[in-house]
């Protein structure tokens, strides 16, 4: 089971679609005003009990094998940062939340992280190798896309 905690933005949207397409159970916990894209939610409907959208981070994290999070205010949203911090205050990935997950659950973050906001320092440090591996692997995937695009046919 994969879960996403935070803003129902591009990361959440991609994880929901990708996770469901590959047969995973996916849970997303977001505040009501920050839900994933309606088209993504329509896509998820046929998957029934393989998808959970909730405001309850505990329900989303329960028995999760991997937990994803992202910043609460992305680049270009600086003017909304305080409002978003207030809205997402209870949506932090921390050791207490991970206690609800599978015993060997992984934590992922697309970086850069705002430690103390969406993820605690302790949790980030404990899972830093996994988090940085994700960032490195994303670089290789991006390079492969560039090669494909530049190669033409």
Predicted regions and their residues:
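Glycine-rich phosphate/diphosphate-binding loop of Rossmann-like nucleotide-binding domains
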Residues: 1-69
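Hydrophobic/aromatic residues located in beta-strands of well-ordered beta-sheets
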Residues: 2, 26, 107-108, 145
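Conserved short-loop catalytic and cofactor-binding motifs
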Residues: 7, 85-86, 133
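Conserved active-site and cofactor/substrate-binding residues in soluble primary-metabolism enzymes
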Residues: 10, 14, 36-39, 55, ...
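Alpha-helical scaffold segments in soluble metabolic enzymes
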Residues: 14, 18-21, 43, 96, ...
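Short, surface-exposed connector motifs at secondary-structure boundaries
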Residues: 22-26, 102-104, 127
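Rossmann-like adenosine-cofactor binding region
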Residues: 45-121
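Adenosine-phosphate binding glycine-rich loop
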Residues: 104-105, 111-153
């Amino acid at each position: 089971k994969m879960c996403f905690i935070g803003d129902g933005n591009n990361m959440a949207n991609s994880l929901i679609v990708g996770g469901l397409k590959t047969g995973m159970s996916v849970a997303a916990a977001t505040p009501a005003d920050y839900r994933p894209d309606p088209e993504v939610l329509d896509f998820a409907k046929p998957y029934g009990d393989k998808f959970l959208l909730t405001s309850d981070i505990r329900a989303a994290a329960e028995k999760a094998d991997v937990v994803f999070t992202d910043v609460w205010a992305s680049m270009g949203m600086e003017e909304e940062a305080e409002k978003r911090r207030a809205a997402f205050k209870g949506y932090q990935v921390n050791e207490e939340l991970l206690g609800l997950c599978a015993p060997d659950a992984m934590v992922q973050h697309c970086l850069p992280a705002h430690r103390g906001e969406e993820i605690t320092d302790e949790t980030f440090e404990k899972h830093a190798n996994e988090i940085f591996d994700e960032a490195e692997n994303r670089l290789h995937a991006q390079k492969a896309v560039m090669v494909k695009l530049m190669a033409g046919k």
